[in-house]
């Protein structure tokens, strides 16, 4: 009697399907983390430029536009001969600013307006020369005897116009919590750079209200931030017992740090000689207010604020010694960005399963 071959259909045990799904989830999460690592590394380095010199040229030279070769900073003679003023685009307490042209490139000329403020102007030039980096507007040349500075032109202007810029159709895609948080990270990176600069610990004094603070920075066409005005950057030197005061007048308002306000009450007239000096932690006090401006009121910005609540509360400690350093704030901002991008990507990962 012949035996018939029996073909038995074998199903996977019920437990194997969940195991396979779990394996797929682990692979997807690992892949997501790898992509996130590369993405964030590109973002943090895409302001792109190393701390030393934005155009990768030797100190005292620059590259502009598509030109491959580095040019030395323009001298008095070169500025007078090769740079053509187009129009006045701004005027502050110290200098007047002109949109200009050099070899078919738009550039900016800044010139002293009041001779009695020449020390402030020359201090700003000294800082600009010494602090050239990815955080600082690019210096193209200068003429001390004519009180003239030549810098790179950024058509989007100062940060005061950020919200208006983000409502231009061309830039509406940038109006997201992610891009706005990246701007806040750029800002804190600049404060961190100033507090640990090659010259020592520098305090951003030209920032007694939000509008004034924003006017010190430029928005680049690729949506990064550069500090532009360095006229008021006093040096803190703890080892020598040297603290600073931002000017010689009384400061008011909630934007400035408590230690910057007159401590002896309204009954005692302000006297600069009696005003106690302070350190760089005044800049830390202002970070939450500036970042709140950056975050705006777009979808997701309140979630970002929630994640930043603790570090911002620490920035607002009345005792300056209890406030975090700029590096600690920067580290927290970057961690929050990483966390929120990962959380935003997770729904897509779940859909894959």
Curated annotation (Swiss-Prot):
Signal peptide (residue range): none
Ranges annotated as spanning the membrane: 20-40
Residue spans, topological domain Cytoplasmic: 1-19
GO biological process, one term: carbohydrate phosphorylation
PROSITE patterns: PROTEIN_KINASE_DOM
Primary localization: endoplasmic reticulum
Gene Ontology terms, MF aspect: ATP binding; carbohydrate kinase activity; phosphotransferase activity, alcohol group as acceptor; protein kinase activity
Membrane topology: Single-pass type II membrane protein
Lineage top rank: taxon: Eukaryota
InterPro entries: Kinase-like_dom_sf, POMK, Prot_kinase_dom, Ser-Thr/Tyr_kinase_cat_dom
Domain Protein kinase: 83-353
Catalytic activity: 3-O-[beta-D-GalNAc-(1->3)-beta-D-GlcNAc-(1->4)-alpha-D-Man]-L-Thr-[protein] + ATP = 3-O-[beta-D-GalNAc-(1->3)-beta-D-GlcNAc-(1->4)-(O-6-P-alpha-D-Man)]-Thr-[protein] + ADP + H(+)
GO cellular component, one term: endoplasmic reticulum membrane
Keywords: ATP-binding, Endoplasmic reticulum, Glycoprotein, Kinase, Membrane, Nucleotide-binding, Signal-anchor, Transferase, Transmembrane, Transmembrane helix
Topology, Lumenal side: 41-353
Localization annotation: Endoplasmic reticulum membrane
EC number of the protein: 2.7.1.183
Glycosylation sites: 163, 237
Protein family: Belongs to the protein kinase superfamily. Ser/Thr protein kinase family. STKL subfamily.
Function text: Protein O-mannose kinase that specifically mediates phosphorylation at the 6-position of an O-mannose of the trisaccharide (N-acetylgalactosamine (GalNAc)-beta-1,3-N-acetylglucosamine (GlcNAc)-beta-1,4-mannose) to generate phosphorylated O-mannosyl trisaccharide (N-acetylgalactosamine-beta-1,3-N-acetylglucosamine-beta-1,4-(phosphate-6-)mannose). Phosphorylated O-mannosyl trisaccharide is a carbohydrate structure present in alpha-dystroglycan (DAG1), which is required for binding laminin G-like domain-containing extracellular proteins with high affinity.
PANTHER family linked: PROTEIN O-MANNOSE KINASE
Protein name per the record: Protein O-mannose kinase
Natural source organism: Gallus gallus (Chicken)
Gene: POMK
């Amino acid at each position: 009697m012949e035996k018939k071959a029996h073909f038995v259909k074998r199903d996977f045990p019920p437990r194997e399907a969940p195991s396979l799904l779990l394996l797929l989830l682990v692979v997807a999460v690992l892949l997501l983390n790898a992509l996130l690592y590369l993405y964030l590394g590109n973002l943090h380095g895409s302001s792109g430029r190393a701390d030393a010199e934005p155009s990768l040229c030797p100190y005292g030279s620059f590259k502009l536009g598509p030109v491959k070769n580095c040019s030395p900073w323009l001298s008095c003679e070169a500025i007078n001969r090769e740079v053509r003023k187009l129009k006045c685009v701004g005027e502050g307490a110290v200098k007047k600013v002109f949109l200009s042209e050099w070899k078919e490139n738009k550039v900016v000329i800044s010139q002293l307006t009041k001779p009695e403020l020449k020390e402030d102007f020359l201090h700003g030039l000294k800082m600009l020369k010494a602090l050239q980096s990815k955080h600082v507007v690019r210096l193209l040349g200068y003429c001390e005897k004519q009180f003239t500075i030549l810098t790179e032109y950024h058509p989007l202007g100062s940060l005061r116009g950020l919200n208006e810029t983000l409502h231009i159709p061309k830039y509406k895609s940038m109006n997201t919590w992610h891009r706005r948080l990246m701007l806040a990270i750029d800002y804190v990176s600049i404060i961190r750079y100033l507090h640990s600069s090659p010259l020592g610990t520098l305090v951003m004094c030209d920032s007694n209200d939000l509008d004034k603070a924003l006017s010190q920075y430029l928005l680049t066409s690729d949506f990064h931030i550069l500090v532009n005005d360095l006229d008021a950057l006093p040096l803190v030197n703890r080892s020598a017992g040297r603290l600073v005061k931002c000017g010689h007048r009384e400061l008011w308002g909630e934007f400035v740090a408590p230690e910057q306000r007159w401590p002896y009450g309204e009954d005692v007239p302000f006297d600069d000689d009696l005003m106690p000096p302070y350190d760089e932690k005044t800049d830390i006090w202002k970070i939450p207010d500036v970042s709140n401006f950056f975050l705006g009121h777009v979808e997701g910005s309140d979630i970002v604020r929630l994640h930043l609540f603790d570090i911002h509360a620490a920035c607002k400690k009345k005792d300056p010694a209890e406030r975090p350093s700029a590096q600690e704030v920067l580290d927290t901002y970057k961690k929050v960005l990483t966390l929120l991008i990962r959380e935003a990507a997770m729904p897509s990962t779940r859909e894959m399963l």
